[in-house]
From Swiss-Prot:
Gene3D superfamilies: bacterial mercury transporter, merf (1.10.287.910). Keywords: Cell membrane, Membrane, Transmembrane, Transmembrane helix. It is a multi-pass membrane protein. The chain crosses the membrane at residues 7-27, 34-54, 69-89. This is Uncharacterized protein HI_1049. GO terms for cellular component: plasma membrane. It is found in: Cell membrane. Its main location: membrane.
């Protein structure tokens, strides 16, 4: 199962009709990984503060606060997966062998 993770991104690009040859150059931007990780976690923490502690309820005109909290935690799990998979994926692949 872990070996199929390498094929997900090309399959998604194929479905949307986008070439993935530009992904070869992304290794040059590895130095930006940690700062962008910090920025995304700070933005998510700010969203948590707005959702849980803010007096003014934001984005609640069409959806209840309870649904927003459930959606927040679902997105949090997905975000943590995408932020950590470059670190965890080699470990998972090593366990599979």
């Amino acid at each position: 199962m872990a070996s199929t993770l390498c094929c997900i991104a090309p399959l998604i690009y194929l479905v949307f009709g986008v070439s993935s040859t530009w992904l070869i150059g992304l290794g040059e931007y590895d130095y930006l990984r940690i700062p962008m990780l910090i920025i995304s976690l700070c933005a998510f923490a700010y969203g948590f503060w707005l959702l849980m502690f803010s007096k003014k309820i934001i984005c609640s005109k069409y959806i209840s606060r309870k649904k927003l909290i459930v959606l927040y935690w679902i997105v949090f799990i997905v975000m943590i997966f995408f932020l950590t998979y470059p670190t965890i994926l080699p470990w998972i692949l090593e366990l599979a062998n």
